[in-house]
Structure formats: C-alpha cells, structure tokens
Amino acid sequence: MSKTKPLSADEISRLEALIGYEFKEKARLDRALTHASARSAAAGNYERLEFLGDRVLGLCVAELLFSTFRNASEGELSVRLNQLVSAESCAAIGDEMGLHNFIRTGSDVKKLTGKAMLNVRADVVESLIATLYLDGGLEASRKFILKYWQGRATSVDAGRRDAKTELQEWAHARFAATPAYRVDDRSGPDHDPSFTVTVEIPGVKPETGVERSKRAAEQVAATRLLEREGVWRKSPTGN
C-alpha cells in the first residue's frame, strides 16, 4: 500500500473555508479525504465514515423533504429522496466543491474511471458529512447538507412517481406484461456494495442500472427505460 502524506495545514484551512466549518479535530478531516488504497484502516481512511455519513445524509434530506413538501405522498417523497442521495448527486456536489483536488488515493484508484470513480467521489462527500457529525454534532452536518441540498430538493422532478410502479403500469397497458428485474452483478466490499440490475419486458430492449443498493439499481434501470421509451422526460439529475 502506498504511503500518503496527510493534508497540510494550508489544505485543511482551504477545506474548512469550502465547508464553512472549523474542525476541532483536524485529523478527522484528513481521514475523511483518504481512500483505503492510500492508507490502512488502522492508519486512517474513510471506509467507516462513509457508512455513517450515508445515514446522516438520508436523515437530514428526509427531514428537509418532509418539512418542505407538506402535501407530498410517501411515494413522492421517496422519489425525491432517492434522487437527492444517489451517488450521482453526491459526486456532483463534491465536484462543485472541488473536493477531488484534496482526495488522497493510491495508484490503483487513480486508474479508475466512470462509475467506479464516481463512487469514490460520492463516498468522500458522505465521509465528510460523517466527520462533521462526529466533530460538531447533527447541527453541523445538517447545516452543511442544507447548504448544498436545499436548492436541489426543489429542482428534482416533482411529478414523477415511483419508477418501478410507473414502468409496471406502462408495461401492463402496452404489452400485457410485467417487468422482470435481474441482478447481473454485485461487487465491492460489504459496507459499500455496487449492484448492477437489468429490467426486461418481452418485446422491449432491456435497460440496466448501477447503484449502491439493489432497490436503487432497480429504480435507475426502470427510470432509464421509461426515459428511453419517451414515457418520461429525462431527469434534471441525469439518473
């Protein structure tokens, strides 16, 4: 495993300015930006942090949606939540912040492209949220999440129903058939898996989705098929 230097004092100061929070324990910020390929868990990387950050993000975004869309059904709230906490959304926020300039990775990860690298960028955002939670409590992480997610909460497609439900009704009406979902691949560690799922309807070209849970991957696959067939317009988030 390659040896990676910790973040410098100048880099930490720049990160704190980007985040809008001054950390009590600076080492936590360094760990949040360090991939396992660059440093072991004992030495400090973000593998455990991303697990916690994912849960904190989900809670805060769910709370935001619950208070913002008071007349929305549970299904509508779930559609918004899935879009807002997806790997694509997290990675986009990390890119907007310029976090890729601070991520510590080993040589193996630097060769990654596409979905694999997108997951790394998303994981860093989640680990950063966990670090804020551990250093400053829920209020510190909530403040950060509101800063970057509040505007996006109203920009996702409010009119969309659950993609799987929409696809099933369309398939029944058009082909008298029920969509079938197949898990093609499961990769990655237990704490950060990646699922590849294909949805098939007789007489229709299949579509594939890749996400960090089987359910989310099914939603992505269903969404892509609906968009390709013109049932839905393309999502603003690009999912």
Swiss-Prot record:
Keyword Flavoprotein: no
Membrane spanning residue stretches: none
Alphabetized Pfam families for the sequence: dsrm, Ribonucleas_3_3
SMART domains, per the entry: DSRM (SM00358), RIBOc (SM00535)
Domain DRBM: 162-231
Primary localization class, coarse: cytoplasm
Cofactor: Mg(2+)
Listed GO CC annotations: cytoplasm
Catalytic activity: Endonucleolytic cleavage to 5'-phosphomonoester
Keyword rRNA-binding included in the entry's annotation: yes
Domain RNase III: 12-137
Active site: 54, 126
InterPro entries linked: dsRBD_dom, RNase_III, RNase_III_dom, RNase_III_sf
Amino acids binding Mg(2+): 50, 123, 126
EC number: 3.1.26.3
Function statement: Digests double-stranded RNA. Involved in the processing of primary rRNA transcript to yield the immediate precursors to the large and small rRNAs (23S and 16S). Processes some mRNAs, and tRNAs when they are encoded in the rRNA operon. Processes pre-crRNA and tracrRNA of type II CRISPR loci if present in the organism.
Family label: Belongs to the ribonuclease III family.
Name of this protein: Ribonuclease 3
Source organism of the structure: Agrobacterium fabrum (strain C58 / ATCC 33970)
